[in-house]
Amino acid sequence: MKEKIIILSGGFDPIHSGHISMFEEARELGDIVVLLNSDEWLIRKKGSFFMDWEDRESVAKNISGVIDVLHFNDDDGTAVQGILDVVKKY
């Protein structure tokens, strides 16, 4: 494990080339923990989702540099709870 944990949060629905570039840059800085927003968050944001949480988790886990993908309470529209979860875990 690297010295730094880099937190990336988002819906990633679907993961596209811009996301991949972000992951590649983050990987240069440290190990990546992904805070993956819920299906409900995507419905509130976009009205629907393309890939469900489990499918998005599977894709994210297979990106080089990702050491963990976490579900978190995003009911308030923020990633605050997820960040606190990462701090507690790592």
Which residues fall in each region the model found?
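Nucleotidyltransferase catalytic core that binds NTPs
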Residues: 1-90
